[in-house]
């Protein structure tokens, strides 16, 4: 329920509930993406708006390095219905700390396509990316290889995907 204001995000969350959505997710406020306290107020308001499970779409700006797993989890524990997060950040150390410290209680999803396989190795429950639909075979191969215990093949699939990504982002 990305919106330019908390009020709009609340309206969208309520609309999602009325249409039968299974859950809602939200990014931090667009005008203060690195202010975690402001984000918590925003997330709490959305969480209070419905009884739907709530996911945080974690997408820090490139300059944000102050977040710790402890701070993230302690803050979001106060958000009603918080059940998981989509982690769109290249900081796999922080992602793994979040997975570890949440004790498997949260649904942890990775975002960057470039680190999908590494995310699986760090404990990701799933992935939401932007290029899976243009090269599904590669990502299915990656997932199936990882699930069958063949990490080498999963990493080879990641290399294939990253070659395509390098061309797309050129």
How should these model regions be labeled?
Residues 1-64, 74:
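Active-site beta->alpha loop and helix N-cap motifs at the rims of alpha/beta catalytic domains
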Residues 48-49, 60-169:
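Catalytic alpha/beta core domains of metabolic enzymes, predominantly
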């Amino acid at each position: 329920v990305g919106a330019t204001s908390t009020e709009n995000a609340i309206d969208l969350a309520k609309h999602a509930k009325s249409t039968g959505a299974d859950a809602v997710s939200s990014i931090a406020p667009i005008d203060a993406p690195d202010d975690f306290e402001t984000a918590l107020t925003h997330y709490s308001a959305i969480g209070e708006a419905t009884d739907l499970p709530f996911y945080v779409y974690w997408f820090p700006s490139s300059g944000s390095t102050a977040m710790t797993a402890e701070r993230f989890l302690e803050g979001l524990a106060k958000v009603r219905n918080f059940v998981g997060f989509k982690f769109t950040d290249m900081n796999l150390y922080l992602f793994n700390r979040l997975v570890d410290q949440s004790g498997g209680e949260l649904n942890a999803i990775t975002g960057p396509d470039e680190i999908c396989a590494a995310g699986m190795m760090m404990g990701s429950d799933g992935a939401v990316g932007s290029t899976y639909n243009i090269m599904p075979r590669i990502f299915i191969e990656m997932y199936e290889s990882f699930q069958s215990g063949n990490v080498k093949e999963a990493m080879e699939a990641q290399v294939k995907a990253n070659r395509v990504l390098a061309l797309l982002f050129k």
